[in-house]
């Protein structure tokens, strides 16, 4: 679901060409296979304490929607980072596409690093993997990072003005505000 929200739906919102969409799907497939490999290897070996730590962490990143019908899995994004996303929209509307492309790429690269931290590195640190599982997990994280960075670096420069604006607007729509959680 996270891949669909962050990558696939973003690509659909930008109305990418079939060739560019194929690259997006290949990247998602690589990340998905890598993630399943890491989860498949580690889940079988987790003890009760590790399972409890994983469940507690998942509860921290789960936020109820205002309608109460569903939940979001989300991580905090700084105000400066939110402003950078909004600035991309402004640059697009002012016709400064080259600068908007650079800003969108920078925004997405930072967002990727944050997502990897929240969705991979923090949970792995909680689980206290041994050396073999830690190595498998680290390879998975770096594969995900490289695939994501490659997609951003290759895709953003090719976006036309309308695609660029649509992509920035989609990214902005992903920025949600949640009330503080209490247990």
What are these regions (language model features)?
Residues 1-183:
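Protein-protein interaction and targeting regions used for scaffolding, dimerization, and localization
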